[in-house]
């Protein structure tokens, strides 16, 4: 950026020198014509007897004559003529009904079919800001004439951003990295979904040097990262237990769903989670998903029934377990087997360690500068339910934290950078994913901003069907299109861009009694 700015300034200086040189050269040349004409008039000025002397084209002679009286008059005349031409062109562009476009057609202001057009300079400055890299603090959206185009800090837009770009369109390099640099400059918190772990490798030290608390939830290599126990945030809250249950069931279905089996497994899982969370004989470090999986796999159905029958009738875990118990023995065996299959990733010792205790505080980003990296796998989805759980609980905890803070906002603004958004899993406890849509529409007032990046609109439609994808995009006031290779995304962006009315000239020939009568027709 700095090199480009220096080159731009150097180009301006060189162009100014060349322009002044050309002006003085032409002024001196025209000044010689004035001088020679004056001499010719003083000698009689008779055509055919004497001739006007030709000017000397030598640059040195022209530059010398530029400082004579006739040279000054010539320079003034050239400046006046040039200014007149510029004023004429500007006035013609402003008041003309039509404007020529660089793409090879003439735009019509009639607006018969539409008035879509690129932003004018005035319109751009009313919504966005132009700044140098050294002074830019807002979200960087692009570059225009050597200046950065940014979303200003005092904007009325909601700051949510949707990025569309196929592989290789530089989503990470051109947009997300710049967003992280701006976040550091503003002193805000960031939570980054990192599918390739490249963001952590490239930017984590920069965050640390700027006083950030840096954590990493590594779902690809759990041994090299911090731990997060999702059950540490329950604290007996049955609604949070329901969210946990729904997220796990919703993100371990492998694209297939059977309400009968899903509901049975959800009831059993919720009962086990609440049993573990409210067991006063268990130390806090054992209240985790690994222990829930141990209860499921180390006890028979009869043993589980005896355990739950010992609970008081009003215990929160009794109701979901009683629903599970209504099934036949064959169905109960199928439910236990199905739930065990969903949670089989907990057989891995590294994953058990990952979910056993918490190094990560979900409310900390709202109180002081934090940078949390969630490293995701872009190859398989067995750990997707953990990333979905993390962001689902994050929205709930941060929103509640903001509501209890002065002004109903997070003291430190929080930015969620969701690269490869579709790899995260379905966020929220609602089976259809509508919880994320609702969260996106209300978190702006809590100073929580979301930037999500997808490769295509089709991906988003598959993850959030039934027009939920439209709600998500509709809640993003900023939409960046970096490139696409599919018709769905291309058609959507084209429709959003609108239609422009252009001028069309055609010639019609009317044959009347075999005598051609041509007519020219212009329209738009």
Regions found by a protein language model. Name each.
Residues 1-169, 173-178, 186, 223:
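Basic- and hydrophobic-enriched, low-structure N-terminal and domain-boundary segments
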Residues 468-496:
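Conserved P-loop NTPase catalytic core
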